[in-house]
Amino acid sequence: MNASTSAPPASDSTWSACSDDAVVPAEVRDAVDTVLGPSGLSRPEREILTTRIERWYPDLIDGLVTLYGDPAATRAAAEVLTEAAAAYVERDPELRHLDLARTLDPTWIQDPSRIGYAGYTERFAGDLRGVEKRIPYLRELGVSYLHLMPLLTPRPGDSDGGYAVADYRSVRPDLGDMDDLAHLTGELRKQNMSLVIDLVLNHVAAEHEWARRARAGEQRYRDYFFIYPDRAEPDEYEK
């Protein structure tokens, strides 16, 4: 194993002494360490993630065992947490700090003084840059929770109000782009405002990559969907 993918030495482990196989299996710890070891993150930064994994691993594995049984559940946990660790490494330090603050105060969202504002981007301000220009107005209203209705790229034409999403990784072109969205969230955070967007994940547009590949016959993607020989049963659901 080369240095770029090796786990940190045991002496530099950020797992707690009690994190034996009864809590987080060695297979999972090793998978996470393979990502964190060469990441360049400080020990405290790595320790924050491993502590969170130790805290929530029982909840994760319970759900995975229900779906896959053992030992497949442990392999799935290792895969999921490897991806989570990679995302954590790439995450903006400002957002990692926000994650920690919210972990320490899990009831933050239930604060009765929190004021929410929901609306459609195009009707409220034209586009995402327009929303950014209206932050002072939102601040004047006391808003701390801004919910922008569907703004991800939908299917062309009838898109169920924007909820038939063709691409979860891009913004509707008439509203801006992902850089505009990232900049808006940063400006909102400076005013202690949280941005919320809708992610409906139980269906996608027929134009979504997964749906296209399923129709093309790729079994992996066909397994993501309920597929019927004709419209008879789906039409019953829509009555």
List PLM regions with ranges.
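Acidic/aromatic-lined carbohydrate-recognition and catalytic surfaces
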Residues: N2-K239
